[in-house]
């Protein structure tokens, strides 16, 4: 195991919370990178309680709505500031047609979207983003480079209907990136 990619939904409650907490603790003990994808329902259902369980994750990934729901913020910058105050220093915020924002201790950078034609359905685009972002970081790319690759993956995933309409592969990313 090289890393843990976790849906924060697993931390909302029920038996999955204890399993997910065990996975996070094992990852911390082994010093494995952890990427937690927030998910809208998780932030709304668990609120600030969720932050307690996410302490120590390497990267927290979310979209703008999820950021605002989790933090109670009215803007992206306010939400990022609140998460930084809570100790989260590595964030990736998906902002739809505007691309994404990568936040590190060194600062924040807006990553331009990857232009694709025929956007059909954004279902699954966030999952593709998270997978590509985690892969890129694990391969040694910078957070900005990871954000670019993740934007591409999310855009390609949105060119088909449904979460599994377009399963983006590494080969797809290589071809599309040129």
Regions flagged by a language model, labelled:
Residues 1-109, 172:
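Ribokinase/PfkB-type carbohydrate-kinase core domain
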Residues 25-29, 74-178:
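Conserved phosphate-binding/catalytic region of the ribokinase-like
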